[in-house]
């Protein structure tokens, strides 16, 4: 295995398309997917140079298990493609008490990205790709203190916030990481 790419949310949409492209370019593709049935199906469709590993971005234990599985099987990761996300879902909270859209799209993504740095530091050309959307531009005001308040929950607004936070994190991470050597 020469080059390894890890893609979250890899069983459909952008993540699935990226997985197919990377596999066709000779990468070994790790598919991080919440739904086991869909993850296994994606692995079969993408081919022998792929491996499905269960990953639920709302569950820190699942994220830890995913990362531990990676460290057990791979010495280095060349590309981390952080794509997993949810949008426009009814209000719910994770077992940690976080609102689910923010937990998936921002908190879980950030947590895993920070862990992935250790697997990428020895690869000079390593890359982190954070998928976001223009939805962040629809935010009219910031209301940090009310993000867990179900009475004002709006699936659109929380999705917009999650994309803004993800993008802000990416800019801050880029400032802090100048060289893995």
Describe each region flagged by the PLM.
Residues 1-181:
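Rossmann-fold NAD(P)H-dependent dehydrogenase/reductase core
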């Amino acid at each position: 295995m020469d080059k390894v790419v890890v893609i979250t949310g890899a069983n459909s949409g952008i993540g699935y398309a990226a997985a197919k492209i990377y596999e066709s370019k000779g990468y070994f593709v790790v598919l991080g997917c919440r739904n086991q049935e869909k993850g296994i199906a994606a692995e079969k469709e993408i081919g022998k140079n792929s491996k499905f590993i269960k990953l639920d971005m709302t569950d820190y234990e699942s994220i830890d298990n995913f990362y531990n599985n990676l460290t057990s099987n791979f010495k280095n990761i060349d590309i981390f493609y952080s794509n997993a996300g949810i949008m426009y879902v009814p209000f719910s909270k994770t077992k940690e008490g976080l609102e689910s859209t923010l937990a998936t799209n921002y908190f879980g993504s950030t947590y895993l990205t920070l862990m992935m740095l250790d697997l990428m530091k020895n690869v000079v050309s390593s890359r982190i790709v954070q998928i976001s959307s223009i939805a962040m531009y629809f935010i009219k005001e910031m209301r940090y203190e009310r993000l867990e308040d179900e009475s004002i929950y709006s699936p659109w607004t929380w999705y917009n916030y999650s994309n803004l936070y993800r993008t802000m994190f990416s800019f801050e991470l880029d400032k802090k990481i100048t060289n893995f050597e």
